[in-house]
């Protein structure tokens, strides 16, 4: 199910869009990102690459033909100075940004899609809620 949603979002995303992935460790944030990036690579006829969690690197970049995807993990960010050094929120950045742990920092990005993942009571199932802002404000999870 997460793969289908990541594919639908990938079909509708454009440069400068931002996807916030919110949820506990192991709930599926990096899995969503892997599905999203591999789907874009497949659509563009680019060889699929391994998509890892950027917990220790803070950032992995993926160039997919004329599209750039920047995958951030803010789990280890301690202050705004460290965040500024990453340059995530610079307006001139024309990449799609996927950000894990965005709730650890304050941001007011206009065009962002928030995916809230949490564990379900059922084994290995997850619950997903989606909130859109800016161009995504009218997003309906049932349409995905």
For each feature predicted by the language model, list its residue ranges.
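Post-Walker A helix-loop "phosphate-sensing" segment adjacent to the P-loop in P-loop NTPases
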Residues: 38-50
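Short phosphate-coordinating micro-motif centered on Lys-Gly-acidic
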Residues: 81-83, 89-144
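Conserved nucleotide-sensing/catalytic segment adjacent to the nucleotide-binding pocket
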Residues: 55, 59-100
């Amino acid at each position: 199910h997460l793969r289908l949603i990541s594919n639908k979002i990938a079909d509708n995303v454009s440069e400068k869009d931002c996807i916030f992935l919110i949820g506990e460790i192991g709930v599926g944030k990096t899995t969503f990102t892997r599905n999203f990036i591999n789907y874009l690579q497949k659509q563009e006829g680019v060889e699929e690459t391994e998509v890892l969690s950027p917990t220790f690197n803070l950032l992995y970049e993926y160039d997919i033909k004329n599209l750039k995807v920047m995958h951030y993990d803010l789990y280890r960010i301690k202050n705004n100075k460290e965040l500024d050094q990453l340059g995530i929120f610079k307006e001139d950045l024309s990449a799609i940004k996927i950000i894990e742990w965005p709730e650890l920092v304050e941001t007011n990005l206009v065009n962002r899609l928030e995916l809230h993942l949490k564990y379900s009571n059922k084994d290995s199932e997850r619950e997903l809620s989606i909130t859109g802002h800016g161009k995504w404000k009218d997003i309906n999870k049932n349409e995905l």
